[in-house]
């Protein structure tokens, strides 16, 4: 027991040292903010954040043996950076709402709890918030591994001049939530149609006699469950904390490989980090082999394409545009050359942005 007592003393000493260093970091962040403000420099620099994350992950693994989990380290440093940044300026983030949805969760994972968040009713509203500079950033869903692409997000890039400034990939884990503390009390289950579709087998097997009801969002389902102990909601863990609901059953989604990718949008371009993606859209001429000739450019320059999607151009029937994600930054020599060639082989080319790849997804 004496050894336990001494170890706890050592933990107390370390905690005090961590607290001292956090306050030192906060003071430095405030000073940096003052310098940036005087020089009219952007307060938030995502490229610098990426550099910090990569450094601490590398040090944790290579120098300290990786005893502390990498994913937990990312979450901790996200909040440290978010809190320090808020001392310089409160970052304003618009997202597809309402609160406690997966888009809200993605935004929190990217910007931390110290940012100021504005939920929006539609994807278009998120774009408008960024375009009008009412928000510094926006967060919108773009694709799910089961449900596919979010077409409305892609369509917005056809008409908007905002840039892609980041991506977030999160696992979609669904839970049965309720104000009751027993699953036996649940008589109705509410959720968004997509969430219900993704856990249909579990519901049929475990709650075969329960009525399943679609509502406009997982957040609305939680609001109903909060008021009625006989109601259950299918939603995220963030929703459980937000609405103070009990988690009656965890991970009820039918597939374990359920991920959603979100895009961060902004008004400015980002500098290369060395681990980037570039997103573009282009239209080809209505002639045989036009798409082949366009895509051949990337093969020629040894550039890997991670995604390609087609969407109607909305200009005339059977006219399509192509959305492509590729590895590399637009300022890299080979990417720059490829995009220059591509412009000559297409009707139009629009670079949507170059941005760091999602952390821990490389």
Swiss-Prot record:
One of its GO terms (cellular component) is cytoplasm. Pfam families: ACT (PF01842), CM_2 (PF01817), PDT (PF00800). Substrate binds at residues 8, 25, 36, 49. GO terms for molecular function: chorismate mutase activity; prephenate dehydratase activity. Its EC number is 5.4.99.5, 4.2.1.51. The keyword Isomerase applies. SUPFAM superfamilies: ACT-like, Chorismate mutase II, Periplasmic binding protein-like II. Transmembrane segments: none annotated. The record marks 260 as: Essential for prephenate dehydratase activity. One of its GO terms (biological process) is chorismate metabolic process. Pathway: Amino-acid biosynthesis; L-phenylalanine biosynthesis; phenylpyruvate from prephenate: step 1/1; Metabolic intermediate biosynthesis; prephenate biosynthesis; prephenate from chorismate: step 1/1. It comes from the Bacteria. It is found in: Cytoplasm. It catalyses: chorismate = prephenate; prephenate + H(+) = 3-phenylpyruvate + CO2 + H2O. Residues 1-92 form the Chorismate mutase domain. Keywords: Amino-acid biosynthesis, Aromatic amino acid biosynthesis, Cytoplasm, Isomerase, Lyase, Multifunctional enzyme, Phenylalanine biosynthesis. Residues 279-356 form the ACT domain. NCBIfam families: PRK11898.1. Catalyzes the Claisen rearrangement of chorismate to prephenate and the decarboxylation/dehydration of prephenate to phenylpyruvate. This is Bifunctional chorismate mutase/prephenate dehydratase. It comes from Aquifex aeolicus (strain VF5). The gene is pheA.
């Amino acid at each position: 027991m004496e050894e336990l007592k001494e170890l706890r003393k050592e933990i107390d000493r370390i905690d005090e040292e961590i607290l001292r260093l956090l306050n030192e970091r906060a003071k430095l962040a405030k000073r940096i903010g003052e310098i940036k403000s005087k020089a009219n420099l952007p307060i938030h620099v995502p490229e610098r954040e990426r550099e910090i994350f990569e450094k601490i992950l590398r040090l944790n693994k290579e120098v300290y043996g990786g005893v502390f989990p990498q994913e937990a380290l990312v979450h901790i440093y996200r909040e440290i950076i978010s809190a320090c940044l808020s001392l310089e300026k409160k970052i304003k983030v618009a997202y597809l709402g309402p609160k406690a949805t997966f888009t809200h969760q993605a935004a929190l994972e990217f910007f931390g709890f110290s940012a100021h968040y504005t939920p929006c009713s539609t994807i278009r509203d998120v774009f408008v918030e960024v375009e009008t500079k009412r928000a510094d950033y926006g967060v919108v869903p773009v694709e799910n591994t089961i449900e596919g692409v979010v077409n409305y997000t892609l369509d917005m890039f056809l008409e908007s001049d905002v840039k892609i400034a980041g991506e977030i990939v999160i696992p979609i884990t669904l839970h049965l939530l309720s104000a009751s503390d027993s699953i036996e009390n649940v008589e109705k289950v509410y959720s968004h149609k997509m969430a219900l579709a993704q856990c249909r087998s579990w519901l049929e097997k475990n709650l075969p006699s329960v009525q399943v009801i679609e509502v406009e969002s997982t957040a609305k389902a939680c609001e109903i469950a909060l008021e009625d102990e006989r109601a259950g909601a299918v939603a995220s863990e963030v929703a459980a904390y937000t609405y103070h609901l009990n988690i009656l059953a965890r991970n009820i989604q039918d597939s374990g490989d359920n991920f959603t990718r979100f895009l961060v949008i902004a008004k400015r371009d980002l500098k290369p980090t060395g681990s980037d993606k570039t997103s573009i859209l282009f239209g080809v001429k209505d002639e045989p082999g036009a798409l082949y000739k366009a895509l051949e450019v990337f093969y020629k320059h040894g550039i890997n394409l991670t995604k390609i999607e087609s969407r109607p151009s909305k200009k005339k029937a059977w006219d399509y545009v192509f959305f492509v994600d590729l590895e590399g930054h637009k300022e890299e020599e080979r990417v720059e050359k490829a995009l220059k060639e591509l412009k000559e082989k297409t009707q139009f080319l629009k670079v949507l942005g170059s941005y760091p790849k999602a952390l821990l997804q490389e």
